[in-house]
């Protein structure tokens, strides 16, 4: 399967902000963007005025990188959001946030979305008591996500849980760290999500 193999820290520098792709490193002073907050490459420090199209494209790339999707995957999510009732941009973010790998990450079962995706693929996650190994599966309100019994002793999962305890869990989730399980209480409202994302630029880009 195709995947983005670009170094994660370079991806953050390319977008000019932390995308939280490397787990705990993103919360430490070791994060490269703290020292080099400019795009990578020979001419990275040059200031360039972007066209409207370039701004829209950069925002789409940023959101894709945050959620770890390839272009075709992201476009398919957008098409689904566009067909739903309501505001397309809000629908888009709700669909992205409802992915099983993203929910597992937000519950603290993986230190990053990419690690959470691996955990899902390796049959370490149960959804409503049944094995679930498709990262793109959309979780519904009321669904119960938990770590499979055989995976509860994995060191990387334990480390992720300890790190998650030091951070706040999104309000639309409820997590039992002792039993490694969590409840997807409701779909997040736009006001609950990151204000650094401008999904309207993606809508403008794909509407052309």
From Swiss-Prot:
Assembly information from the UniProt record: Part of the 30S ribosomal subunit. Contacts protein S5. The interaction surface between S4 and S5 is involved in control of translational fidelity.
Single Gene Ontology BP annotation: ribosomal small subunit biogenesis
Occurrences of domain S4 RNA-binding (ranges): 98-159
Keyword RNA-binding recorded: yes
Family annotation (Gene3D superfamilies): Ribosomal Protein S4 Delta 41, Chain A, domain 1 (1.10.1050.10), RNA-binding S4 domain (3.10.290.10)
Disulfide links within the chain: none
Keywords recorded for this protein, A-Z: Ribonucleoprotein, Ribosomal protein, RNA-binding, rRNA-binding
Name of this protein: Small ribosomal subunit protein uS4A
Family from the record: Belongs to the universal ribosomal protein uS4 family.
HAMAP family hit by this protein: Ribosomal_uS4_B
One cellular-component annotation, GO: small ribosomal subunit
Described purpose of this protein according to its UniProt entry: One of the primary rRNA binding proteins, it binds directly to 16S rRNA where it nucleates assembly of the body of the 30S subunit. With S5 and S12 plays an important role in translational accuracy.
Gene: rpsD1
Gene Ontology MF, one: structural constituent of ribosome
SUPFAM superfamilies reported in the protein's UniProt record: Alpha-L RNA-binding motif (SSF55174)
Source domain of life: Bacteria
Annotated CDD domains: S4
